[in-house]
Amino acid sequence: MSGLFITFEGGEGAGKSTQIALLASHLRNHGFDPVITREPGGSPGAEAIRHVILSGNAETYGPAMEALLFAAARADHVDQLIRPALAEGRIVLCDRFIDSSRAYQGVTGNLDATYMAAIERIAIDGAMPDLTLVLDICAERGLSRAGKRRGSDTADRFEKEDIAVHEARRQAFLEIARQEPARCKVIDADRSQEKIADEIRSVVDTILTEKGLL
C-alpha cells in the first residue's frame, strides 16, 4: 500500500470529525485529494452494521458479539474502501479504527486481549495505520461537548454510558499511545480548534515531507 493511512481516535466529544475536516482542507490546499471515512461504517456493508451497533440492538448479546460485528464492518471497510484508496496513493483519514475496538470492547468490555488481537488481525489483514492521532480530553468535558453537538437528538449507545466508563476508555487510548509511540501521537484536545489543528498539521506535514510528498 503506497498511500498514507491516518486514523483519529479519542473519546466522545474529542473533536475528531472537526479535526478531520480541517486536516482534509489543509491537504487539499497542498494538492492532495484525501479520502474521508469513519468507523463503524465507510462502506455499504459496514454502514448497515453501524446502524445495528449504534442503535443498541447488539448490546443485548454482549461485548463479544459487538466486537465481532465491529470486526465484520472493519473487514468490509478495509476491503472495499481503505485498501483500494491506499493502492491509488491516496491519503485516507479515518474517524476511529482498531484502537476504538481495543478501548471500547477490549478494555471496558472486559474482553480477552488475545481474542481481540485475533479478530483485529483478521479484520485489517495488514492494513495498519501509518499514524494515529489520539485526541485526548477528560471524559466530563468530552461528554459535555458531545451533548451540545447532538442538541435534541438522542444519545447513541455509547454516549449513554457512565462517566467512569468513558474515563476508563480515555486511559485505554493513552496506554495504547504509550505502548505504540512510533504510530500514535497524543494531541491535547482541550484547546481551541485552531491550536489543535495547527499541531495536527505540523505532525502530518512532517511525515509528508519525510516521504518527499510535500
From Swiss-Prot:
Keywords, in A-Z order: ATP-binding, Kinase, Nucleotide biosynthesis, Nucleotide-binding, Transferase
* Disulfide linkage: none
A single GO molecular function term of this UniProt record: dTMP kinase activity
Q: Identify the GO cellular component terms for this protein.
A: cytosol
UniProt family annotation: Belongs to the thymidylate kinase family.
Question: What SUPFAM superfamilies does its record include?
Answer: P-loop containing nucleoside triphosphate hydrolases
- Record's protein name: Thymidylate kinase
Return the EC number: 2.7.4.9
Sum up the protein's function in the record's words. Phosphorylation of dTMP to form dTDP in both de novo and salvage pathways of dTTP synthesis.
Please give a single GO biological process term from the UniProt record.
Answer: dTDP biosynthetic process
Q: Source organism's superkingdom?
A: Bacteria
Pfam families xref list: Thymidylate_kin
Q: Which organism is it from?
A: Brucella suis biovar 1 (strain 1330)
The entry's ATP-binding residues are 10-17
Q: Which Gene3D superfamilies match?
A: P-loop containing nucleotide triphosphate hydrolases
Q: Coiled-coil segments, which residues?
A: none
The reaction(s) this protein catalyses: dTMP + ATP = dTDP + ADP
Signal sequence coordinates: none
